[in-house]
Amino acid sequence: MDSDTLRVFQNELICCICVNYFIDPVTTDCVHSFCRPCLCLCSEEGRAPMRCPLCRKISEKPNFNTNVALKKLASLARQTRPQNINSSDNICVLHEETKELFCEADKRLLCGPCSESPEHMAHSHSPIGWAAEECRVQKLIKEMDYLWKINQETQNNLNQETSKFCSLVDYVSLRKVIITIQYQKMHIFLDEEEQRHLQALEREAKELFQQLQDSQVRMTQHLEGMKDMYRELWETYHMPDVELLQDVGNISARTDLAQMPKPQPVNPELTSWCITGVLDMLNNFRVDNALSTEMTPCYISLSEDVRRVIFGDDHRSAPMDPQGVESFAVWCAQAFTSGKHYWEVDVTHSSNWILGVCRDSRTADTNIVIDSDKTFFSISSKTSNHYSLSTNSPPLIQYVQRPLGWVGVFLDYDNGSVSFFDVSKGSLIYGFPPSSFSSPLRPFFCFGCT
Protein backbone atom coordinates (compact mmCIF):
# COMPACT_ATOMS: atom_id res chain seq x y z
CA MET A 1 0.00 0.00 0.00
CA ASP A 2 1.60 3.34 -1.07
CA SER A 3 1.92 6.21 1.41
CA ASP A 4 -0.92 8.29 -0.10
CA THR A 5 -3.36 5.38 0.05
CA LEU A 6 -2.25 4.62 3.62
CA ARG A 7 -2.77 8.24 4.62
CA VAL A 8 -6.29 8.26 3.16
CA PHE A 9 -7.06 5.00 4.95
CA GLN A 10 -5.78 6.37 8.27
CA ASN A 11 -7.85 9.55 7.86
CA GLU A 12 -10.98 7.41 7.62
CA LEU A 13 -10.20 6.16 11.14
CA ILE A 14 -9.96 9.64 12.67
CA CYS A 15 -12.86 11.35 14.45
CA CYS A 16 -13.50 14.84 13.06
CA ILE A 17 -14.33 16.16 16.54
CA CYS A 18 -11.29 15.12 18.60
CA VAL A 19 -9.02 14.56 15.54
CA ASN A 20 -7.80 11.28 17.05
CA TYR A 21 -8.37 7.65 16.18
CA PHE A 22 -11.94 6.61 16.95
CA ILE A 23 -12.88 5.65 20.53
CA ASP A 24 -15.90 3.33 20.64
CA PRO A 25 -17.10 4.64 17.23
CA VAL A 26 -20.79 4.95 16.35
CA THR A 27 -22.44 5.78 13.03
CA THR A 28 -25.44 8.13 12.98
CA ASP A 29 -28.52 7.87 10.77
CA CYS A 30 -26.86 10.27 8.31
CA VAL A 31 -23.89 7.82 7.96
CA HIS A 32 -21.37 10.05 9.75
CA SER A 33 -19.10 8.37 12.30
CA PHE A 34 -17.85 9.81 15.59
CA CYS A 35 -16.39 8.67 18.88
CA ARG A 36 -19.24 7.88 21.26
CA PRO A 37 -17.69 10.11 24.01
CA CYS A 38 -17.27 12.97 21.51
CA LEU A 39 -20.90 12.62 20.42
CA CYS A 40 -22.02 12.61 24.06
CA LEU A 41 -20.01 15.73 24.86
CA CYS A 42 -21.40 17.50 21.77
CA SER A 43 -25.02 16.57 22.43
CA GLU A 44 -25.98 19.94 23.93
CA GLU A 45 -25.91 18.83 27.56
CA GLY A 46 -27.50 15.48 26.73
CA ARG A 47 -30.81 16.93 25.62
CA ALA A 48 -32.98 15.38 22.93
CA PRO A 49 -33.17 15.41 20.00
CA MET A 50 -29.63 14.35 19.06
CA ARG A 51 -28.18 16.29 16.10
CA CYS A 52 -25.27 15.24 13.90
CA PRO A 53 -22.30 17.57 14.64
CA LEU A 54 -21.45 17.67 10.91
CA CYS A 55 -24.74 18.05 9.02
CA ARG A 56 -27.00 18.94 12.02
CA LYS A 57 -29.55 16.34 10.94
CA ILE A 58 -31.73 15.06 13.78
CA SER A 59 -31.25 11.36 14.55
CA GLU A 60 -34.42 9.32 14.90
CA LYS A 61 -32.94 7.12 17.64
CA PRO A 62 -31.08 8.53 20.68
CA ASN A 63 -28.81 5.51 21.18
CA PHE A 64 -26.39 4.10 18.63
CA ASN A 65 -24.70 0.72 18.39
CA THR A 66 -20.92 0.51 18.30
CA ASN A 67 -19.45 0.21 14.79
CA VAL A 68 -17.43 -2.92 15.62
CA ALA A 69 -15.45 -3.03 12.36
CA LEU A 70 -14.41 0.61 12.67
CA LYS A 71 -13.55 0.08 16.33
CA LYS A 72 -11.19 -2.81 15.51
CA LEU A 73 -9.46 -0.88 12.72
CA ALA A 74 -9.00 2.19 14.93
CA SER A 75 -7.62 0.02 17.73
CA LEU A 76 -5.09 -1.59 15.37
CA ALA A 77 -4.09 1.83 14.04
CA ARG A 78 -3.47 3.10 17.56
CA GLN A 79 -1.35 0.07 18.45
CA THR A 80 0.77 0.30 15.28
CA ARG A 81 1.37 4.06 15.32
CA PRO A 82 4.93 5.21 16.17
CA GLN A 83 5.56 5.26 19.91
CA ASN A 84 7.48 8.14 21.47
CA ILE A 85 9.33 5.86 23.88
CA ASN A 86 12.95 6.91 23.28
CA SER A 87 12.97 9.92 25.59
CA SER A 88 15.52 10.04 28.39
CA ASP A 89 12.77 9.52 30.96
CA ASN A 90 11.93 6.20 29.33
CA ILE A 91 15.47 4.75 29.39
CA CYS A 92 16.18 2.14 32.05
CA VAL A 93 18.82 3.52 34.42
CA LEU A 94 20.09 0.01 35.24
CA HIS A 95 20.37 -1.48 31.74
CA GLU A 96 20.33 1.71 29.62
CA GLU A 97 17.70 0.18 27.36
CA THR A 98 14.34 1.58 26.26
CA LYS A 99 11.37 0.56 28.39
CA GLU A 100 9.08 -1.14 25.90
CA LEU A 101 7.06 -3.42 28.21
CA PHE A 102 4.37 -2.85 30.83
CA CYS A 103 4.21 -4.99 33.98
CA GLU A 104 0.58 -5.83 34.77
CA ALA A 105 1.33 -6.69 38.39
CA ASP A 106 3.41 -3.65 39.36
CA LYS A 107 1.86 -1.22 36.86
CA ARG A 108 5.34 -0.15 35.73
CA LEU A 109 7.21 0.29 32.45
CA LEU A 110 10.14 -2.13 32.06
CA CYS A 111 12.97 -2.80 29.65
CA GLY A 112 13.58 -6.33 28.34
CA PRO A 113 16.26 -7.34 30.90
CA CYS A 114 14.20 -5.97 33.81
CA SER A 115 11.21 -8.05 32.72
CA GLU A 116 13.36 -11.19 32.93
CA SER A 117 14.73 -10.36 36.37
CA PRO A 118 13.64 -12.49 39.37
CA GLU A 119 11.54 -9.58 40.62
CA HIS A 120 9.35 -9.51 37.49
CA MET A 121 9.90 -12.90 35.85
CA ALA A 122 6.64 -14.38 37.17
CA HIS A 123 4.57 -11.34 36.17
CA SER A 124 2.61 -10.80 32.97
CA HIS A 125 4.17 -8.27 30.56
CA SER A 126 2.71 -6.60 27.50
CA PRO A 127 3.98 -4.25 24.79
CA ILE A 128 3.24 -0.62 25.60
CA GLY A 129 0.81 -0.14 22.69
CA TRP A 130 -1.21 -3.24 23.54
CA ALA A 131 -1.27 -2.45 27.27
CA ALA A 132 -2.40 1.13 26.64
CA GLU A 133 -5.20 -0.09 24.35
CA GLU A 134 -6.34 -2.60 26.99
CA CYS A 135 -6.40 0.18 29.57
CA ARG A 136 -8.51 2.31 27.26
CA VAL A 137 -11.00 -0.45 26.48
CA GLN A 138 -11.22 -2.21 29.85
CA LYS A 139 -11.02 0.80 32.15
CA LEU A 140 -11.62 4.17 30.55
CA ILE A 141 -14.42 3.34 28.12
CA LYS A 142 -16.32 1.31 30.74
CA GLU A 143 -15.99 4.11 33.28
CA MET A 144 -17.06 6.72 30.72
CA ASP A 145 -20.09 4.62 29.75
CA TYR A 146 -21.05 4.29 33.42
CA LEU A 147 -20.57 8.00 34.09
CA TRP A 148 -22.66 8.95 31.06
CA LYS A 149 -25.46 6.66 32.21
CA ILE A 150 -25.42 8.33 35.64
CA ASN A 151 -25.30 11.68 33.87
CA GLN A 152 -28.42 10.88 31.86
CA GLU A 153 -30.30 9.56 34.90
CA THR A 154 -29.47 12.68 36.89
CA GLN A 155 -30.48 14.91 33.97
CA ASN A 156 -33.84 13.12 33.77
CA ASN A 157 -34.34 13.50 37.52
CA LEU A 158 -33.46 17.19 37.27
CA ASN A 159 -36.04 17.63 34.50
CA GLN A 160 -38.64 15.91 36.68
CA GLU A 161 -37.81 18.14 39.63
CA THR A 162 -38.19 21.22 37.44
CA SER A 163 -41.54 19.93 36.21
CA LYS A 164 -42.67 19.20 39.79
CA PHE A 165 -41.74 22.72 40.84
CA CYS A 166 -43.81 24.32 38.07
CA SER A 167 -46.70 21.93 38.72
CA LEU A 168 -46.57 22.59 42.46
CA VAL A 169 -46.70 26.36 41.93
CA ASP A 170 -49.96 26.01 39.99
CA TYR A 171 -51.27 23.39 42.40
CA VAL A 172 -50.68 25.55 45.47
CA SER A 173 -52.50 28.44 43.81
CA LEU A 174 -55.41 26.14 42.96
CA ARG A 175 -55.46 24.65 46.45
CA LYS A 176 -55.72 28.13 47.96
CA VAL A 177 -58.84 28.68 45.86
CA ILE A 178 -60.59 25.43 46.82
CA ILE A 179 -59.76 25.92 50.50
CA THR A 180 -61.19 29.44 50.36
CA ILE A 181 -64.37 28.16 48.68
CA GLN A 182 -64.76 25.45 51.33
CA TYR A 183 -64.46 27.93 54.18
CA GLN A 184 -66.93 30.30 52.54
CA LYS A 185 -69.59 27.59 52.92
CA MET A 186 -69.11 27.59 56.67
CA HIS A 187 -70.00 30.07 59.39
CA ILE A 188 -68.33 33.46 59.66
CA PHE A 189 -66.54 32.54 62.88
CA LEU A 190 -64.30 30.16 60.88
CA ASP A 191 -62.64 33.07 59.05
CA GLU A 192 -59.71 33.13 61.46
CA GLU A 193 -59.16 29.38 61.04
CA GLU A 194 -59.24 29.82 57.28
CA GLN A 195 -56.49 32.44 57.45
CA ARG A 196 -54.38 30.22 59.73
CA HIS A 197 -54.83 27.36 57.29
CA LEU A 198 -53.74 29.47 54.30
CA GLN A 199 -50.75 30.82 56.20
CA ALA A 200 -49.69 27.28 57.13
CA LEU A 201 -50.05 26.27 53.47
CA GLU A 202 -47.85 29.22 52.48
CA ARG A 203 -45.18 28.26 55.00
CA GLU A 204 -45.28 24.58 54.04
CA ALA A 205 -45.29 25.37 50.33
CA LYS A 206 -42.32 27.70 50.84
CA GLU A 207 -40.42 24.87 52.54
CA LEU A 208 -41.31 22.47 49.71
CA PHE A 209 -40.25 25.01 47.09
CA GLN A 210 -36.96 25.41 48.95
CA GLN A 211 -36.53 21.62 49.12
CA LEU A 212 -37.16 21.33 45.38
CA GLN A 213 -34.78 24.21 44.65
CA ASP A 214 -32.13 22.64 46.90
CA SER A 215 -32.71 19.32 45.16
CA GLN A 216 -32.27 21.01 41.79
CA VAL A 217 -29.00 22.55 43.00
CA ARG A 218 -27.74 19.20 44.32
CA MET A 219 -28.64 17.42 41.11
CA THR A 220 -27.06 20.17 39.01
CA GLN A 221 -23.86 19.99 41.07
CA HIS A 222 -23.87 16.20 40.86
CA LEU A 223 -24.44 16.45 37.12
CA GLU A 224 -21.57 18.91 36.68
CA GLY A 225 -19.30 16.74 38.82
CA MET A 226 -20.06 13.69 36.70
CA LYS A 227 -19.41 15.71 33.52
CA ASP A 228 -16.08 17.02 34.85
CA MET A 229 -15.05 13.50 35.80
CA TYR A 230 -16.13 12.25 32.39
CA ARG A 231 -14.04 14.94 30.70
CA GLU A 232 -11.01 14.05 32.86
CA LEU A 233 -11.27 10.43 31.80
CA TRP A 234 -11.70 11.52 28.19
CA GLU A 235 -8.57 13.66 28.42
CA THR A 236 -6.69 10.82 30.12
CA TYR A 237 -7.76 8.53 27.30
CA HIS A 238 -6.01 10.77 24.78
CA MET A 239 -2.74 10.96 26.73
CA PRO A 240 0.34 9.47 25.08
CA ASP A 241 0.75 5.83 26.05
CA VAL A 242 3.63 6.43 28.45
CA GLU A 243 1.87 9.26 30.31
CA LEU A 244 -1.37 7.27 30.38
CA LEU A 245 0.24 4.22 31.91
CA GLN A 246 2.20 6.28 34.40
CA ASP A 247 -1.09 7.86 35.45
CA VAL A 248 -3.04 4.58 35.54
CA GLY A 249 -2.77 4.36 39.32
CA ASN A 250 -4.75 7.59 39.69
CA ILE A 251 -7.58 6.49 37.41
CA SER A 252 -9.23 4.25 40.00
CA ALA A 253 -8.95 6.96 42.67
CA ARG A 254 -10.73 9.48 40.45
CA THR A 255 -13.44 7.10 39.31
CA ASP A 256 -14.20 6.04 42.89
CA LEU A 257 -15.99 9.39 43.21
CA ALA A 258 -18.55 8.12 40.69
CA GLN A 259 -19.74 5.58 43.26
CA MET A 260 -21.03 8.32 45.55
CA PRO A 261 -24.82 8.17 46.21
CA LYS A 262 -26.96 9.97 43.66
CA PRO A 263 -29.20 12.79 44.95
CA GLN A 264 -32.75 11.46 45.32
CA PRO A 265 -35.85 13.27 44.01
CA VAL A 266 -38.09 15.12 46.48
CA ASN A 267 -41.64 13.88 47.04
CA PRO A 268 -43.61 17.11 47.64
CA GLU A 269 -46.51 16.53 50.02
CA LEU A 270 -48.67 19.13 51.75
CA THR A 271 -50.39 18.58 55.09
CA SER A 272 -54.18 18.28 55.05
CA TRP A 273 -55.25 20.46 57.96
CA CYS A 274 -58.42 19.73 59.94
CA ILE A 275 -61.42 21.91 59.14
CA THR A 276 -63.35 22.42 62.35
CA GLY A 277 -66.86 21.00 62.25
CA VAL A 278 -66.78 19.93 58.61
CA LEU A 279 -67.62 16.27 59.31
CA ASP A 280 -70.46 17.28 61.63
CA MET A 281 -71.84 19.44 58.85
CA LEU A 282 -71.46 16.71 56.23
CA ASN A 283 -73.10 14.06 58.40
CA ASN A 284 -76.32 16.07 58.17
CA PHE A 285 -76.47 14.78 54.58
CA ARG A 286 -75.26 11.26 55.27
CA VAL A 287 -76.55 8.44 53.07
CA ASP A 288 -76.59 5.08 54.87
CA ASN A 289 -75.58 2.02 52.83
CA ALA A 290 -74.69 4.26 49.89
CA LEU A 291 -72.78 1.44 48.20
CA SER A 292 -74.15 -2.02 47.48
CA THR A 293 -72.59 -5.05 49.18
CA GLU A 294 -72.67 -6.90 45.85
CA MET A 295 -69.33 -6.68 44.03
CA THR A 296 -69.22 -6.75 40.22
CA PRO A 297 -66.08 -8.01 38.42
CA CYS A 298 -64.88 -5.45 35.89
CA TYR A 299 -61.85 -4.15 34.03
CA ILE A 300 -60.66 -0.60 34.60
CA SER A 301 -58.80 1.50 32.06
CA LEU A 302 -57.60 5.09 32.33
CA SER A 303 -57.86 7.54 29.45
CA GLU A 304 -54.61 8.91 28.00
CA ASP A 305 -54.86 12.31 29.71
CA VAL A 306 -55.56 10.75 33.11
CA ARG A 307 -52.67 8.26 32.76
CA ARG A 308 -50.28 11.04 31.73
CA VAL A 309 -50.99 13.08 34.87
CA ILE A 310 -50.81 10.11 37.27
CA PHE A 311 -47.79 8.30 35.85
CA GLY A 312 -45.94 11.09 34.01
CA ASP A 313 -43.47 10.02 31.28
CA ASP A 314 -44.04 6.33 32.11
CA HIS A 315 -47.82 6.49 31.56
CA ARG A 316 -47.78 4.13 28.55
CA SER A 317 -46.29 1.28 30.59
CA ALA A 318 -48.26 2.03 33.76
CA PRO A 319 -50.86 -0.33 35.27
CA MET A 320 -54.66 -0.08 35.00
CA ASP A 321 -55.30 -1.25 31.45
CA PRO A 322 -58.36 -3.20 30.26
CA GLN A 323 -56.37 -6.39 29.74
CA GLY A 324 -54.86 -6.21 33.24
CA VAL A 325 -55.87 -7.87 36.49
CA GLU A 326 -59.57 -8.11 37.19
CA SER A 327 -60.99 -5.47 39.57
CA PHE A 328 -64.17 -5.28 41.62
CA ALA A 329 -66.66 -2.42 41.53
CA VAL A 330 -69.73 -1.51 43.58
CA TRP A 331 -72.41 1.08 42.81
CA CYS A 332 -75.06 2.76 44.86
CA ALA A 333 -78.52 1.28 44.45
CA GLN A 334 -79.82 4.82 43.97
CA ALA A 335 -78.88 7.46 41.40
CA PHE A 336 -79.04 11.10 42.55
CA THR A 337 -80.64 13.89 40.52
CA SER A 338 -80.80 16.64 43.18
CA GLY A 339 -79.90 17.55 46.76
CA LYS A 340 -76.86 17.06 48.99
CA HIS A 341 -75.51 13.60 49.80
CA TYR A 342 -72.56 12.36 51.89
CA TRP A 343 -71.15 8.85 52.33
CA GLU A 344 -67.93 7.23 53.52
CA VAL A 345 -65.87 4.33 52.14
CA ASP A 346 -63.15 2.30 53.89
CA VAL A 347 -59.96 2.11 51.78
CA THR A 348 -57.76 0.69 54.56
CA HIS A 349 -57.00 -2.61 52.84
CA SER A 350 -56.35 -1.38 49.30
CA SER A 351 -53.54 0.73 47.86
CA ASN A 352 -55.24 0.98 44.46
CA TRP A 353 -58.77 2.30 44.36
CA ILE A 354 -61.10 4.65 42.49
CA LEU A 355 -63.87 6.44 44.36
CA GLY A 356 -66.47 9.03 43.41
CA VAL A 357 -69.57 9.46 41.24
CA CYS A 358 -70.30 8.66 37.61
CA ARG A 359 -73.19 8.91 35.20
CA ASP A 360 -75.89 6.33 35.80
CA SER A 361 -75.49 4.94 32.24
CA ARG A 362 -72.04 3.56 33.11
CA THR A 363 -73.25 1.04 35.66
CA ALA A 364 -74.00 -1.52 32.95
CA ASP A 365 -70.39 -1.59 31.72
CA THR A 366 -67.85 -4.21 32.77
CA ASN A 367 -65.05 -2.44 30.89
CA ILE A 368 -64.88 1.00 32.51
CA VAL A 369 -62.83 3.85 31.07
CA ILE A 370 -61.89 6.53 33.59
CA ASP A 371 -61.81 9.87 31.76
CA SER A 372 -62.81 13.48 32.50
CA ASP A 373 -66.30 13.35 30.98
CA LYS A 374 -68.95 13.83 33.70
CA THR A 375 -67.18 11.54 36.14
CA PHE A 376 -65.68 12.79 39.38
CA PHE A 377 -63.18 10.39 40.89
CA SER A 378 -60.40 10.34 43.43
CA ILE A 379 -57.77 7.79 42.30
CA SER A 380 -55.19 6.12 44.54
CA SER A 381 -52.50 4.14 42.73
CA LYS A 382 -49.29 2.34 43.62
CA THR A 383 -46.46 1.91 41.09
CA SER A 384 -43.41 0.04 42.41
CA ASN A 385 -42.99 1.63 45.86
CA HIS A 386 -44.49 4.98 44.92
CA TYR A 387 -48.03 5.95 45.94
CA SER A 388 -49.94 8.70 44.19
CA LEU A 389 -53.28 10.40 44.73
CA SER A 390 -55.05 12.14 41.87
CA THR A 391 -58.37 13.30 40.49
CA ASN A 392 -59.67 13.06 36.95
CA SER A 393 -61.81 16.03 35.95
CA PRO A 394 -59.49 17.57 34.90
CA PRO A 395 -56.64 15.08 35.52
CA LEU A 396 -54.62 16.45 38.45
CA ILE A 397 -52.03 15.10 40.89
CA GLN A 398 -52.99 15.81 44.52
CA TYR A 399 -49.94 16.92 46.53
CA VAL A 400 -51.51 15.96 49.87
CA GLN A 401 -51.17 12.97 52.15
CA ARG A 402 -52.98 9.88 50.86
CA PRO A 403 -55.89 8.80 53.12
CA LEU A 404 -55.24 5.46 54.82
CA GLY A 405 -58.64 4.79 56.38
CA TRP A 406 -62.10 6.12 55.57
CA VAL A 407 -62.72 8.57 52.73
CA GLY A 408 -65.82 10.77 52.70
CA VAL A 409 -67.56 11.86 49.48
CA PHE A 410 -69.89 14.87 49.40
CA LEU A 411 -72.14 15.44 46.38
CA ASP A 412 -73.99 18.75 46.12
CA TYR A 413 -75.96 18.09 42.96
CA ASP A 414 -77.81 21.40 42.78
CA ASN A 415 -74.59 23.44 43.04
CA GLY A 416 -72.59 21.08 40.79
CA SER A 417 -70.06 20.20 43.50
CA VAL A 418 -68.18 17.00 44.44
CA SER A 419 -65.66 16.96 47.33
CA PHE A 420 -63.49 14.34 49.03
CA PHE A 421 -62.48 14.27 52.71
CA ASP A 422 -60.02 12.36 54.88
CA VAL A 423 -62.36 11.21 57.66
CA SER A 424 -59.65 10.37 60.22
CA LYS A 425 -58.24 13.92 59.99
CA GLY A 426 -61.43 15.82 59.26
CA SER A 427 -59.59 17.47 56.37
CA LEU A 428 -60.27 18.32 52.74
CA ILE A 429 -58.61 16.17 50.08
CA TYR A 430 -60.01 17.97 47.05
CA GLY A 431 -63.08 19.83 45.84
CA PHE A 432 -63.91 19.86 42.13
CA PRO A 433 -64.64 23.29 40.64
CA PRO A 434 -68.41 23.91 40.45
CA SER A 435 -70.08 22.63 37.28
CA SER A 436 -73.57 21.88 35.99
CA PHE A 437 -75.01 18.35 36.32
CA SER A 438 -77.61 17.29 33.76
CA SER A 439 -77.79 13.50 34.18
CA PRO A 440 -78.29 11.17 37.18
CA LEU A 441 -75.09 10.52 39.17
CA ARG A 442 -74.42 7.29 41.04
CA PRO A 443 -71.79 6.65 43.76
CA PHE A 444 -69.01 4.34 42.56
CA PHE A 445 -66.13 2.49 44.23
CA CYS A 446 -63.57 0.18 42.64
CA PHE A 447 -60.65 -1.57 44.31
CA GLY A 448 -57.89 -3.98 43.30
CA CYS A 449 -57.48 -2.07 40.04
CA THR A 450 -53.89 -2.97 39.10
From Swiss-Prot:
Q: Which SMART domains match?
A: BBOX, SPRY
Q: Where are the zinc fingers (RING-type)?
A: 15-56
Instruction: Please give the biological process terms from Gene Ontology that the record holds.
Output: innate immune response; regulation of gene expression
Residues noted as binding Zn(2+) in the record, renumbered to the chain: 92, 95, 114, 120
Name any one GO molecular function: zinc ion binding
Q: Which PROSITE patterns match?
A: B302_SPRY, ZF_BBOX, ZF_RING_1, ZF_RING_2
Keyword field: Coiled coil, Metal-binding, Zinc, Zinc-finger
User: Which parts form a coiled-coil structure per UniProt?
Assistant: 191-218
Enumerate the spans annotated as B30.2/SPRY domain. 269-450
InterPro entries to which the protein is assigned, alphabetical: B30.2/SPRY (IPR001870), B30.2/SPRY_sf (IPR043136), Butyrophylin_SPRY (IPR003879), ConA-like_dom_sf (IPR013320), SPRY_dom (IPR003877), TRIM/RBCC (IPR050143), Znf_B-box (IPR000315), Znf_RING (IPR001841)
ZnF segments: B box-type? 87-128
The answer, when asked if Aminoacyl-tRNA synthetase is one of the entry's keywords, is no
- GO CC annotations, alphabetized: cytoplasm
Q: Name one Pfam family in it.
A: zf-B_box
**Family the entry assigns:** Belongs to the TRIM/RBCC family.
Q: What name is this protein filed under?
A: Tripartite motif-containing protein 64C
